[in-house]
Amino acid sequence: MVPLMELDELCLLDMLVYLEGFMAFVSIVGLRSVGSPYGRYSPQWPGIRVPARPAWFIQELPSMAWPLYEYIRPAAARLGNLPNRVLLAMFLIHYVQRTLVFPVLIRGGKPTLLVTFVLAFLFCTFNGYVQSRYLSQFAVYAEDWVTHPCFLTGFALWLVGMVINIHSDHILRNLRKPGETGYKIPRGGLFEYVSAANYFGELVEWCGFALASWSLQGVVFALFTLSTLLTRAKQHHQWYHEKFEDYPKSRKILIPFVL
């Protein structure tokens, strides 16, 4: 028999998933009209701004801390099962890279508006809790789920997406030589096909995670990722075309050959 407290938390997780889906819809509608206020698109409003490196570290930290907490917590009921451990590890690995590695590699990132930083921190806290608690406490998989075609395909997409994301970030960081300023057209890798190759990689990564986890939690997270990254990708695409007369006309916005 499932304890009452676990039933209450499962109901809470269900409500939070639907809330995240609603947030994805609001994000698509809202950001379409105002754009994504970060980086070079950050409005010149007065107020507090957070330096790029600490902003990235702090805002991503909750999504690394939640799965780590679940791994060391003896009462994590489902982490005795291999599929749950692997899926939670997939989530954790991404956020270890985003929390501990990515901020260190940033070169001259623009300060982040406090409100943007706070919203990102709250989302990572919220989503980190939803994904970590579901996988560690409630998700039920057969032991051989890790050999199922859905899991294997999803895991492959997750891995390929992460490689694309990290490689594309590397290209962006190295556009300027030491001492150079200004902007350049990204070239190489998936940037030959889309304006936002790093975002495409992250989208593929979370779509793979959703397929591998075969869960509403994973699907909604992938949809939320699409809702935010598509807006940013459109901004990049438009900005590149306005900034550079020789910007390749054949490049798509986010998805090669499609969008």
Curated annotation (Swiss-Prot):
Recorded topology in the membrane: Multi-pass membrane protein
GO molecular function list: 3-oxo-5-alpha-steroid 4-dehydrogenase (NADP+) activity; 3-oxo-5-alpha-steroid 4-dehydrogenase activity; amide binding; NADPH binding
Keyword Oxidoreductase: yes
KW Endoplasmic reticulum (keyword) present: yes
Biological processes, Gene Ontology terms: androgen biosynthetic process; androgen catabolic process; androgen metabolic process; bone development; cell differentiation; cellular response to cAMP; cellular response to dexamethasone stimulus; cellular response to epinephrine stimulus
Intracellular or extracellular location(s): Microsome membrane; Endoplasmic reticulum membrane
Record note on pH: Optimally active at alkaline pHs.
Catalytic activity: a 3-oxo-5alpha-steroid + NADP(+) = a 3-oxo-Delta(4)-steroid + NADPH + H(+); 5alpha-pregnane-3,20-dione + NADP(+) = progesterone + NADPH + H(+); 17beta-hydroxy-5alpha-androstan-3-one + NADP(+) = testosterone + NADPH + H(+); androst-4-ene-3,17-dione + NADPH + H(+) = 5alpha-androstan-3,17-dione + NADP(+)
Induction: Its expression is regulated by androgens such as testosterone.
EC number: 1.3.1.22
GO cellular component: cell body fiber; endoplasmic reticulum membrane; neuronal cell body; perinuclear region of cytoplasm
EC supergroup of this enzyme: oxidoreductase
Alphabetical keyword list: Differentiation, Endoplasmic reticulum, Lipid metabolism, Membrane, Microsome, NADP, Oxidoreductase, Sexual differentiation, Transmembrane, Transmembrane helix
Secretion signal span: none
Transmembrane segments: 10-30, 86-106, 111-131, 146-166, 206-226
UniProt tissue specificity: Liver and prostate (at a low level).
Function: Converts testosterone into 5-alpha-dihydrotestosterone and progesterone or corticosterone into their corresponding 5-alpha-3-oxosteroids. It plays a central role in sexual differentiation and androgen physiology.
Family classification: Belongs to the steroid 5-alpha reductase family.
Protein name: 3-oxo-5-alpha-steroid 4-dehydrogenase 1
Natural source organism: Rattus norvegicus (Rat)
Organism classification: Eukaryota, Metazoa, Chordata, Craniata, Vertebrata
